[in-house]
Amino acid sequence: MDKIKTTHVGSLPRSKKLSEILFRKDKNELFDQGELDKIIEEDVNKIVKKQIDIGIDIISDGEMSKISYATYVKDRLHGFSGESERRAPKDLDDFPSYKEKIAKSGGTPTYTRPCCTADLKIKDTKSLTKDISNLKSALKKNNHSQGFINSASPGVISNFLPNKFYKNDDDYLVALSKMMKTEYDEITKNDLLLQIDCPDLALARHMTFKNVSDEEFLVRAEKQIECLNEATKDIDASKSVSYTHLTLPTTMLV
């Protein structure tokens, strides 16, 4: 019988020490970059070893360096500023008292979510280089070969960091896909698998596009898939690419 390899969606719990510094960085408060780099490297080593110890085959870095799976992009690209409007999901709109209870609970972390207010350009490539180096180093220390790094899709970025600059959302998606292509290509060129987080094909239906018809949403979804295909066109066909479509209890890997 062939072995069925095990993996997961990528993001894993950060240590309290790491979380505190990531939030300070996210809020533009003072932090020590050298200390942050050291903690990330140490925590990646720990989380890689833990995954291997429990029997996971395809290992991730746990996204230790990222404040969230989508909004980390604001730190790697020029063109974001201000703060975006927070949209409650449609299913919560239907139950306002419950929505109010959730909002008051304080259980959901508040990340900085700016808008796109200028032409997008690459700002920081060092963070990705460090992510790749940390994961490959940890894999080597633990005599393991297969690992993957998560990267946000153009569509999910546009959901959390909305367009306030480009003529229309199509132009914004095209610009995002050009920027993210660099990240996708770099991950796969370094012999790592790529997992693209794209819940925009489901999550955005009841957030960004909650007030449009099904027909209008399908047009938007087609454009997002088109841009994602363009961004991944140069990835070697022998490389595995997985796409996480849902942020609900079930995650579909294609």
Predicted regions located by residue number:
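Acidic, glycine-rich loop-and-beta core segments that form the ion-binding/anion-interacting portion
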Residues: S213-V241
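Conserved small/polar residues in nucleotide/adenosyl-binding loops
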Residues: T244-T250
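Alpha-helical packing segments of well-folded alpha/beta enzyme cores
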Residues: L36-V48, D131-L135, L176-Y184, Q224-A231
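Active-site-proximal, glycine-rich beta->alpha crossover segments in alpha/beta enzymes
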Residues: V9, P13-N28, S81-V219
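Conserved, mostly hydrophobic/aromatic
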Residues: I4, Q51, I149, I187, ...
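Class II aminoacyl-tRNA synthetase catalytic cores and aaRS-like
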Residues: M1-S11
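TRNA-binding/sensing appendages of the translation machinery
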Residues: E29-A70
